[in-house]
Amino acid sequence: PLGISKEEKDNIAFSSFPDTHVFSDGDLVFSWRVREVPLDASNASPPAPSKPAPPRRSPSVRESMTRSVSWLRRSRNEAVVDASPRLHSRSTSYLYGYTYFLQRRDTSRRRGYFQKSLVILSHLPYVGLFHQVIARLGPAFFEHGMVVLESFVHDVIRWPSPEPGLTLSVSVLGTLLHASLPHGLEAQNGDGMQSGTSASLPILASVPSTPLIQVFYELLPDLWRLWECMLTAEPILIVGRDPRTTSDAVWHLVDLIRPVPVAGDFRPFFHIHDYDFRAFVTRATPPTGVVLGATNPFFLQTCATWPHIVQLGRGDKPAHQGRDTPTARIVSSSKRRVNKDTTLLKQLLQWRDSPSQLEHANAVLRRYFSDLTER
């Protein structure tokens, strides 16, 4: 047994499924973060959704999985500096979940769909690396079954220990991935869009692979305001159409202010069943420095008094957006104090629609805010 409390199991279960209708048939990779809850914590939490019993495994495979998870849960001290415990939990540690969600039409099922998620749990906030890993593992697992998971477990056992500041090479189902690990809270330079299959172009482990310039496509002029809010520990609610969009947005905001640590708590994908829901949402005033990513429109009503609310769009040209696409906007109660770099912004607005310029534009934008934070 891995020593996961009932509260953590509930959180893992609810966090691993989109809290919105994303598509009829398709898959989605996203990430989330939940607080570790001590095993002796109160059991007063929402019930987890019913799930079929997991397939039986041989003792050797179970033992191997325990060892592989111990690697994925290693190096807690290299995680982003966390806030003090809140309300229900006495823990200051977090679990990161990297999820592959699959949905297919299936008329034989009561709801008409086959829906399952495969999740990698880790104490390491390496969103860039683990998104690449789960994106390879998920499709293979759902096509070939447990034999893929067993092969992956044996791969993980052979992974070297993650050393901050170095490039890590790991095998994933026959593919060798190279990832540049951050040195503490230092910013990682580059565009963050590499697949990691080349040692000369490694994955930036702490940076989402979806470009910053694409995630905030319609809101590029507002990045200066968001950067300022992150530095001054202002509460921010981010609402998007799916958990990949919101989780990438939150991760990018965390990356935007490196090497300054996040002053409060951040949740890339947050839902109403989270163990800390009351601590964040039902208070008269939101906690200082908390950043929540959500897909449920319920949060727009419940958190209407928050000082900064971001609604994300599709991340592409208006001509490609349908009627149901939400209008991208930021509602903020404070006045921006930092001046925009209008020259850079004008250039970014030209680059964002050019596929050949996307990598360069993303690298320039990330470098700009890294330098701005260092001043």
Model-found features: residue ranges?
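Acidic, Ser/Thr/Pro/Gly-enriched alpha-helical scaffold modules and adjacent low-complexity linkers
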Residues: 1-375
